[in-house]
Regions:
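Basic, amphipathic alpha-helix used for nucleic-acid engagement in HTH/winged-helix/SANT-Myb modules
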Residues: 1-24, 86-90
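Short alpha-helical elements
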Residues: 5, 60-64, 92
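Conserved aromatic-histidine-acidic binding/catalytic patches
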Residues: 13-17, 35, 50
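Short, amphipathic alpha-helical "recognition" segments used to contact nucleic acids or chromatin
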Residues: 18-42
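Short alpha-helical "recognition helix" segments of helix-turn-helix
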Residues: 43-52
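Major-groove recognition helix of helix-turn-helix-like DNA-binding domains
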Residues: 53-77
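Short Lys/Arg-enriched helix C-cap and helix-to-coil transition segments
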Residues: 68-92
Length: 92
């Protein structure tokens, strides 16, 4: 049986890399803020709950990853492309 966490197949270490988590966090932030048009504080709360990290740490990550977010925003991925990359997540 294949084991997965946050949509990624995990090895025997049962961990995913921070880079993978951050990539998914940016994608979820883009989805919630740009496609669903949720308020910033609601998005931060949902990301904090989803990834089990504090809201302050979510904001620090978003600040540190702002270039990646800007690239994603320029590419304007659709829900379908996000769903294709992470099919385990709800993109509706």
């Amino acid at each position: 049986m294949e084991r997965r966490f946050l949509g990624y197949r995990i090895a025997s270490t049962n961990a995913i890399s921070r880079e993978q988590r951050n990539e998914l966090l940016i994608a979820r932030y883009y989805y919630m803020s740009e496609l669903k048009r949720l308020r910033f504080d609601d998005v931060i709360f949902r990301l904090s709950s989803t990834f089990f990290i504090s809201d302050i740490y979510v904001m620090r990550l978003l600040s540190a990853l702002s270039e990646q977010f800007d690239l994603m925003k320029a590419e304007r991925p659709t829900r379908e492309s996000l769903r294709a990359k992470w099919p385990e997540w709800d993109w509706n």
